[in-house]
């Protein structure tokens, strides 16, 4: 049965596309105080399946994934789900950052990043602010 409680209904959905389990766990821990419904997939093919079921409000995506590059997946998201915000995260060079932004990423977050940098990035692209 679908949970229709007010707190669940108001939560924004974040999809993390990241193949490294430790990084995903770290992101979950960093965002523990945020009022987000967080889902995680490890590949682009799993992300496509996820999008067929529901569109998240925000995607936090690594670039190097087992079945392709996140940079190439941005255009799929932006074309089919224009309301979904995309934050690319990677330890790549400045040229890759430029390509990610040119492909439609709303923001590029360079690894490693702090909790405040991650939360600021989410708030900047979505306008979400945690209720006190």
Briefly describe each language-model feature range:
Residues 1-15, 116-132:
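Non-catalytic signal-transmission and effector/linker regions of two-component phosphorelay proteins
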Residues 21-39:
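Two-component/phosphorelay signaling modules centered on CheY-like receiver
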Residues 40-58:
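Acidic, metal-coordinating helix/loop segments flanking the phosphotransfer/catalytic sites
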Residues 43, 69-72:
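Acidic catalytic/metal-coordinating carboxylates
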Residues 49, 71-81:
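Short amphipathic alpha-helix used as the core "switch/output" element in two-component signaling
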Residues 62:
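Active-site residues of response regulator receiver
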Residues 72, 92-109:
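Alpha4 helix (beta4-alpha4-beta5 surface) of REC/receiver domains from two-component response regulators
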